[in-house]
Amino acid sequence: MIKGIGIDAVELSRIKPIVEKQGSFIQRVLTPNELTLFEKLSTKRQIEFLAGRFACKEAFSKAWGTGIGKVGLQDIEVLTEKTGAPYVANSPHNGKVFVSITHTETMAIAQIVLESE
């Protein structure tokens, strides 16, 4: 049974200056494991990655029904399968979590579906 669905979109133009300055926002959004993946990418891919992960965590908080104030960005970890598919490795949700992230030239969009146990 579906517990919640969340979707979020992030403009890449808002993330680009953050990546270029290597600001503290990056450490607030990404877990240490996500940061390891992030650091291996080109600047263009870092912008897409950070925007996608932020959108994913926002979408999770919407699906969870609390918003980001009740669940922290560090509480949700989105890693990558060998195939390139994202998956939620850690979260406060005990059931299954389905994630989809897509990018255009200007946006990153993520959708989360939470399934109850």
From Swiss-Prot:
GO molecular function: holo-[acyl-carrier-protein] synthase activity; magnesium ion binding
Keyword Nucleotide-binding: no
Binding site for Mg(2+): 8, 58
Cofactor: Mg(2+)
HAMAP family linked: AcpS
Family that this chain belongs to: Belongs to the P-Pant transferase superfamily. AcpS family.
Function according to Swiss-Prot or TrEMBL: Transfers the 4'-phosphopantetheine moiety from coenzyme A to a Ser of acyl-carrier-protein.
Protein name per UniProt: Holo-[acyl-carrier-protein] synthase
Gene (UniProt): acpS
